[in-house]
Regions:
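Alpha-helical transmembrane segments in multi-pass membrane proteins
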Residues: 4-51
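Residue-level signature of transmembrane alpha-helical entry/exit and packing/kink sites
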Residues: 7-11, 32-37, 63, 67-71, ...
Length: 205
């Protein structure tokens, strides 16, 4: 089990590596953005290599259209959940942090990261590594992976009450995504639903 935790830790550290470019001191924003792009491709490549080497996920195969349509229905469910939450409680602290990142990165680079790169790295770490690799798609793995997924998206909330309702929101979204992974046993479908959900959030749909 130690080896599995080690691999999961490697994937987690890699997934956060690109963002570190923007906390470096004495480096211009232009160079930080260039370094960020380089780190994105570096991180994607090595995260996938590690995942395949240790059987965290299966190799990627061509998508099946019936399963893609299945994913679209769950994307709609995710957006409905988010809209209900926002209409009741307003934006989360995670939304505010994402806006800060967007201002630093620029809209185009931020959207590329949020829509295409972030979902891949998060799915490999939380659902590929934790739910599947560490806990073999068990109920325990399902619960742990989605609580951690929720925690990572709301650890900066200003009060315990807001934190609790935010972690419930993001954990529920994680559950919807991981249910797709559980049913299909293919990480590309959970990545797809995650990408589509982030795309709709990016265009404020």
């Amino acid at each position: 089990m130690k080896e599995k935790y080690k691999v999961t830790g490697q994937l987690f550290l890699l997934s956060n590596l690109p963002i570190c470019c923007f906390i470096l001191k004495d480096i211009s924003l232009v160079y930080a953005r260039l370094l960020f792009v380089l780190f994105l491709f570096f991180t994607l490549y090595f995260s996938y290599k590690i995942s395949i080497k240790h059987n965290v996920i299966n190799r990627i195969h061509k998508l099946e259209w019936n399963k893609v349509l299945y994913c679209l229905a769950f994307v709609a469910l995710m957006r409905l959940t988010v809209h209900l939450y926002l209409s009741s409680f307003g934006d989360t602290q995670n939304d505010a942090l994402l806006q800060i990142l967007k201002d630093i990165m620029g809209v185009e680079l931020f959207n590329f990261y949020a829509i295409f790169v972030g979902p891949v790295l998060e799915e490999l770490t939380f659902h590929g590594a934790i739910m599947n690799y560490c806990y073999n798609m068990s109920r325990k793995g399902f619960i742990i992976s989605n609580i951690l997924f929720g925690f990572m998206h709301c650890m900066n909330e200003p009060s315990i009450g807001i934190f609790i309702r935010s972690i419930l929101l993001y954990s529920l979204l994680g559950c919807i995504i991981s249910y797709i992974y559980y049913r299909t046993k293919r990480i590309e479908y959970s990545v797809l639903i995650h990408m589509l959900a982030n795309f709709l959030a990016a265009i404020d749909f």
